[in-house]
Design a protein with these regions (language model features):
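A residue-level detector for the "anchor" residue at the start of short, highly conserved motifs
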Residues: 1-77
Length: 77
């Protein structure tokens, strides 16, 4: 499917590496959450929405140093 990323039990680090290709700047994954598993379909034309969805469904936070430098880290309690 064009414009859609389909993930089936994909490592979070691998999903974010793929998202990084479709977004200006950089998306990085902290080692503490890199091996979390992700499944779903994600629209590549809205990477912010993907990051929001990950934050809502996984124990992660999304830290924006700027619009162009994003890191996904373990959620704080």
């Amino acid at each position: 499917m064009d414009g859609i990323l389909v993930a089936s039990n994909l490592r979070l680090a691998d999903l974010l590496a793929e998202i990084d290709r479709y977004r200006p700047g950089r998306v990085r994954c902290d080692a503490a959450v890199a091996n979390l598993r992700v499944s779903g379909t994600y629209p590549l034309d809205d990477t912010d929405r993907i990051l929001d969805t990950l934050r809502e469904t996984l124990p992660v936070d999304v830290e924006y140093l700027s619009r162009y430098w994003v890191t996904v880290v373990a959620a704080r309690d």
